[in-house]
């Protein structure tokens, strides 16, 4: 039986050098909590999710329904309600594991700028955790998420996903 949830976490390793190094840690589990616990078991350190900048959901997660995942992130004590949420055109792991021309991972803050840019050019939306929770619980409203995809050595915006209830 394969794991239902996969978590891919970008971790910034602070150093004395001019630029901090970003690494990727992955975990799998039967729930979002199990997958995130597997990340913790990988390196023995508890990630500081309160510092999270983005949450990227894979297409399959969006198709299955947002309620369980969003419920976890709104109830998890270290999760922040203003984290930008994006949907990957395919796998979230591909987005967070995108390597740039210099061989370094594209950083979460740069990916977050894609959603924020939509405020200025109207090509996409910016959605935070609390927005999605309110849209899921509000009568007559449906969640929407910016869609991103990997394009070579970059992550680009590719539209907006509109949900029916909690499913894509």
Question: PLM features: what roles do these ranges have?
Answer:
Residues 1-168:
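A glycine-rich, acidic short-motif signal
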């Amino acid at each position: 039986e394969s794991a239902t949830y996969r978590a891919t976490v970008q971790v910034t390793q602070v150093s004395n050098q001019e630029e901090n190094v970003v690494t990727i840690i992955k975990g799998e589990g039967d729930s979002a909590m199990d997958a995130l616990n597997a990340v913790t078991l990988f390196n023995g350190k508890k990630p500081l999710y309160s510092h999270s900048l983005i949450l990227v959901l894979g297409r399959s997660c969006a198709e299955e329904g947002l309620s369980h995942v969003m419920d976890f992130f709104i109830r998890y004590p270290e999760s922040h309600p203003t984290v930008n949420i994006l949907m990957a055109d395919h796998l979230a792991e591909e987005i967070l594991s995108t390597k740039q021309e210099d061989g370094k991972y594209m950083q979460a803050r740069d990916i977050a700028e894609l959603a924020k840019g939509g405020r200025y050019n109207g090509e996409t939306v910016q959605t935070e955790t609390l927005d999605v929770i309110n849209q899921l619980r509000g009568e007559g409203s449906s969640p929407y998420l910016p869609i991103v995809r990997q394009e070579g050595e970059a992550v680009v915006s590719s539209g907006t996903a509109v949900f029916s209830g909690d499913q894509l």
